Amino acid sequence: MTSRKKLADYVMMGFVLMVGFVASLGFAKAKADSKPDEIVVADLLTVKEPKSEAESRLRVIRLTTQSGATGYGDYFEFGLPAENEEATLARLVNRYAAQGYKQNIFLTDPSMRAVGSGHTVLGQTAKDVLNAKTREWPGRAMYHREGFGSMWQGTGKSGLIISLQAALLDLAGETGPGKVRLCPSIRIDREEEGTRRLCTPEEMKQRVTSLKQAGFTAVRLELAGALDQQMKSRGECPPYRYPQEVLGQIDKLLSAAKEAAGVEMDVIVAAHRNLSTDGMTYLALRCERNEVTLLENPMALRHLSEQGEARKEFSQPLGFGGDYHAIEDFAQGIKKHIGTVLVPDAGYIGGVSMITRTADLAKEAKLQVAPVVRGGPLSLLAVARSLSGRGEVLWVTSPYQDEWLKEDGVLKNPLKMTDGVLVTDSCEIDETKFQVKRIAQEEIKSAKK
């Protein structure tokens, strides 16, 4: 009887241990399956009742984790019909071509960005995506110069890169000051009844004066739109040289802008990478005469060598790099002395990490850097944080900067600026002013009973 009782006790003890072991396995599995930091939802937010062109074009990406944490990034619509824009965004969110750091076989610079591996945003944590490495392919002796490849090319798509990174950095808890000088970018034309026309000198004065009164100490004038239409109507195709008549129109606008800017503001002229060597020279001479601080991007990357030779004809400072996708391109531009200021586009070059690396390259070469961000306040702040306090940074350029200073705008707390320098540490949108549309969602599998 005693033996049987002991046996029963042992059996019961074993059963209890087994149940406990199974329960612990179930708990461990449940814990493993529960990933509170995993991104499961991507939404697109648009302003319900836009009061300006900036607000009507603003798009905000919201990434949400299983725990309910959210991260935000923004960009501007890029001309696609709404359904195509949403489909494009969903595809890019689900396959984010994160940059990697690979040894560049052509130069000693190790930061050349390789492509080839896509990384999924949904189903991963922000930390995993931001730190993902691209796949090594031993024996492959070539890295694509196109940067992120064809899926990232096309009007406006590069803006999505910095937008997604801004949202991921927000989720990852990226904080800190964004102390950089701001430079709003404005066009020299305006739209009327569906067509674009050049501004009048008086209109240009008013626009620059308004920015000056808002506290900005630099302004960037974009030469595109109406000017390109004029050249096309003349049967010209890039690279071209503006005829004297068109140069005269530009000259009047530069003179008006400089008069309004006075000595308190720098005036920057941004060409559209569409000029020939003669075209660049003639425009540079006009800029010199109007005491323009910097002429940006007069020629495309494919004319890098020609630009290096042609700039010997004038002393106007040149910025370069608006269409560069790789650090190698900047290194070659520096080697050929094609300019004194590196002007990387945050989207084209690959986002925050590569903007920082470009600034490092400028510092090593004893040059300066003036990045361009084609996004709203969230993307602007993400880039500003990465460059805060660096002496080689002249300014950070983006459109509609004055809109983000307004008290009644789409931000809960508007951006703050002192003496033309951004002093805001954080930026939060007012979600009550936005409408939300679900773009992508990961299916969460329920536990089997």
Model-predicted regions and their roles:
Residues 179-308:
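Metal-dependent enolase-superfamily TIM-barrel catalytic cores that perform enediolate-based chemistry
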Residues 151-194, 214:
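Glycine-rich, aromatic-flanked loop segments that form ligand/cofactor-binding clefts
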Residues 2-14:
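Bacterial N-terminal signal peptides that target proteins for export
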Residues 75, 184-186, 221-223, 269-273, ...:
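A cross-domain feature marking catalytic cores of carbohydrate-active enzymes
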Residues 12-23:
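Bacterial N-terminal signal peptides
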Residues 29, 33-59:
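Short, Gly/Pro- and small/polar-rich lid/capping loops
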Residues 64-170:
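Metal- or metallocofactor-binding catalytic centers and their adjacent structured scaffolds
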Residues 91, 285, 291-294, 302-422, ...:
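Shared catalytic-loop signature of beta/alpha-barrel
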